[in-house]
Design a protein with these regions (language model features):
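Short acidic-hydrophobic, aromatic-tinged amphipathic segments that line or gate anion-handling sites
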Residues: 45-51, 123-127, 158
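Internal nucleotide-binding/catalytic subdomain
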Residues: 158-240
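ATP-binding N-terminal substructure of ATP-dependent carboxylate-amine bond-forming enzymes
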Residues: 1-96
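General beta-strand structural signal in soluble alpha/beta enzymes
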Residues: 5, 30-31, 69-70, 91-94, ...
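Short, charged, surface-exposed secondary-structure boundary motifs
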Residues: 39-41, 55-57, 100-106, 219-221
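A conserved helix-loop-beta module that forms one wall/lid of the active-site cleft
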Residues: 92-154
Length: 240
């Protein structure tokens, strides 16, 4: 079996390493991979960008790849799974529509509200003044989120009106996150520990996997700005 892993981070290195442990896997390719995956047995990096879907399809077809596993959110939101499936290629990941739950915070929050799934109160804004007035009305602390993908850095916890105003202006007027910040979701600040419960679904069946806890703050003690993730561990003790 030949496997393609799409992405360049530690997540993709871990996926590639695990796939390479199976006897039935003869070769794992990572597009584009990183310095760590380049050193592993049975693993080869290829110089194809993770968002270059036509080039990825061409590689899969030319190398007779048995299954592709997608790591990053961006190609999923672009519809890589749909395009692979249209070509009859095996790929693991959510469809373009399902990926909007990750790709658009407004889409996700609206989905939760529409289906009566508990979530923090929120509003969506495209203009700065109404957004700032909403913050004044709701009080602090409050959470300002760029609607789209921002490499895990599009969430600001504002403890003062000045911080909230700066974040809103930065996203909506300053174009800090480009198209991803053309809308902002302003959300209630919830206290407590955050954890993820990961399941696989196919539309009919649910397969529970594992719990995980991501740590995004840059500095020790959960301080500093959010990053794409300083580290994570699984299972998460906070989930019983």
């Amino acid at each position: 079996m030949k496997v393609l892993i799409i992405g360049s981070g530690g997540r993709e290195h871990a996926l590639a390493w695990q796939c390479a442990q199976f006897d039935e896997v003869v070769q794992v390719f990572v597009a584009p991979g990183n310095a760590g995956s380049a050193l592993e047995n049975k693993i080869s990096n290829i110089q194809v960008d993770s968002e270059d879907i036509p080039a990825l399809i061409k590689f899969v077809q030319s190398e007779s790849i048995d299954i592709t596993i997608v790591g990053p959110e961006a190609p999923l939101v672009m519809g890589i799974v749909d395009e692979f499936q249209d070509k009859g290629l095996s790929i693991f990941g959510p469809s373009k529509l399902a990926s909007q739950l990750e790709g658009s915070k407004a889409f996700c929050k609206d989905f939760l509200a529409r289906n009566n799934i508990p979530t923090a109160f929120y509003e969506v804004f495209t203009e700065t003044l109404p957004a700032i007035e909403y913050v004044k009305k709701k009080g602090l602390p409050i959470v300002i989120k760029a609607d789209g993908l921002a490499a895990g850095k599009g969430v600001i916890i504002a403890n003062t009106l000045s911080e909230a105003t700066h974040a809103i202006n930065d996203m909506l007027d300053g174009n800090r996150f480009g198209e991803a910040g053309s809308r902002v979701v302003i959300e209630e600040f919830l206290r407590g520990e955050e954890a993820s419960f990961i399941v696989m679904v196919d539309g009919n069946n649910i397969l529970p996997m594992a719990t995980s806890q991501d740590h995004k703050a840059r500095d020790n003690g959960d301080k500093g700005p959010n990053t794409g993730g300083m580290g994570a561990y699984s299972p998460a003790p906070v989930v019983s």
